[in-house]
UniProtKB/Swiss-Prot annotation:
This is Cysteine desulfurase IscS. Pathway: Cofactor biosynthesis; iron-sulfur cluster biosynthesis. The keyword Iron applies. The keyword Transferase applies. The active site is at 328 (cysteine persulfide intermediate). One of its GO terms (biological process) is [2Fe-2S] cluster assembly. Keywords: 2Fe-2S, Cytoplasm, Iron, Iron-sulfur, Metal-binding, Pyridoxal phosphate, Transferase. GO terms for molecular function: 2 iron, 2 sulfur cluster binding; cysteine desulfurase activity; metal ion binding; pyridoxal phosphate binding. Its main location: cytoplasm.
Length: 404
């Protein structure tokens, strides 16, 4: 067993060896190294064919037309291209956007930028379960609403939003619907023929593909128009100029194909390991699961251990690679904005740990994780005066703390 045990699959996944092998064939003089846009010789044709195959593999994952797949540098760029692209193209129709407070920073910060440009954004507050009711979205819609952007699976708590129902609502109101599917593509079955999604962001490195590559699904029926953010040679039907990175794209395509083929088997195993982990630690006193218990992605477990500081717990769990939020915000000492939006107080938000399980997690690793967590929580609480007060029956919320 390799230490530390990797339980941070929501931050990134290792590249599947089958994917790495495919990528290696697109780099050197012996491989498919040409520029896919070079139409005058075989090196270019071979690269173009490799990209076409990968485009079909990514399209197959979500049941899209390959012409609806635009390759980007990752889900962050896809989110930016979708939201800014729609806002700038349809600005004469309206300048109002609806999103939620628990979206990824790539969506929230893009919306903040649009606010600086004169757009208006409504940030919806989810229920304590993390779910956003469709009625709440409907109530926020206005005559000038042009876009709704709601993620399918939350990166911190793993809850699954009902994008089918939200899509129906948006389509009936003729409002464009964007879904950030970075955490769900390759893990949940997605069918854009039945789910009324207009734009969908996908990440390569969240599904055992390489970093630095992503895709944006752009619907053709109904046709969605975007204003490009990257200008140049007119690649990707003018939506995203720049020489296509064949090896990255081939890697993402192969990762998508494997994810589609292995999804059911992978998910059953991952869900079993997640349940094993939760059943192993849920009996620890004052331990709470964050987010809806039923509607959640199979690999995700966000747990608050009351009276334990998250940072000190992470240091105590040195044999486990876990996080106290998303990788994009864990550098800040602020409590998770996602957990705060669910109504957790600062103390509970600070005492939470995100465990995310994936394709290469083993039973042995989960057993070791359970023992490590139990031991660490016990040790930290023994040192905690707050835990002692709580055990003595003192209501900590009623205590008047002196400020020195």
């Amino acid at each position: 067993m390799k230490l530390p045990i990797y339980l941070d699959y929501a931050a990134t996944t290792p590249v599947d060896p089958r994917v790495a092998e495919k990528m290696m064939q697109c780099l050197t003089m012996d491989g498919i190294f040409g520029n896919p846009a070079s139409r005058s010789h075989r090196y270019g044709w071979q690269a173009e064919e490799a990209v076409d195959i990968a485009r079909n593999q990514v399209a197959d994952l979500i049941n899209a037309d390959p012409r609806e797949i635009v390759f980007t540098s990752g889900a962050t760029e896809s989110d930016n291209l979708a939201i800014k692209g729609v806002a700038h193209f349809y600005h004469k129709k309206g300048k109002h956007i609806i999103t939620s407070k628990t979206e990824h920073k790539a969506v929230l910060d893009t919306c903040r930028q649009l606010e600086r440009e004169g757009y208006e954004v409504t940030y919806l507050q989810p229920e304590p379960s993390g779910l956003i009711p469709v009625a709440m979205i409907e109530a926020a819609m206005r005559e000038d609403t042009i876009l709704v952007s709601i993620m399918q699976v939350n990166n911190e708590i793993g809850v699954i939003q009902d994008i089918d129902a939200i899509g129906e609502l948006c389509r009936s109101r003729k409002i464009i619907f964007h879904v950030d599917a970075a955490q769900s593509a390759g893990k949940l079955p997605i069918d854009v023929q039945t789910t009324k999604v207009d734009l969908m962001s996908i990440s390569g490195h969240k599904m055992y593909g390489p970093k630095g590559i992503g895709a944006l699904y752009v619907s053709r029926k109904p046709r969605i128009r975007l204003e490009a953010a990257m200008h140049g040679g007119g690649h990707e039907r003018g939506m995203r100029s720049g020489t296509l990175a064949t090896h990255q794209i081939v890697g993402m395509g192969e990762a998508a194909a494997i994810a589609k083929a292995d999804m059911v088997v992978d998910n059953e195993r991952i869900a079993r390991l997640r349940d094993k982990l939760w059943n192993g630690i849920k009996h620890i006193e004052e331990t709470y699961i964050n987010g809806d218990v039923e509607k959640r992605a199979c690999g995700s477990l966000n747990v608050s251990f009351n009276f334990v500081e998250g940072e000190s717990l992470m240091m105590a769990l040195k044999d486990l690679a876990v996080s106290s939020g998303s990788a994009c915000t864990s550098a800040s000492l602020e409590p998770s904005y996602v957990l705060r939006a669910l109504g957790l107080n600062d103390e509970m938000a600070h005492s939470s740990i995100r465990f995310s399980i994936g394709r290469f997690t083993t039973d042995e690793e989960i057993d070791h994780a359970i023992e490590t967590i139990k031991e660490s929580i016990g040790n930290l609480r023994e040192m905690s005066p707050l835990w002692e007060m709580f055990k003595d029956g003192i209501d900590l919320d009623s205590v008047q703390w002196a400020h020195h």
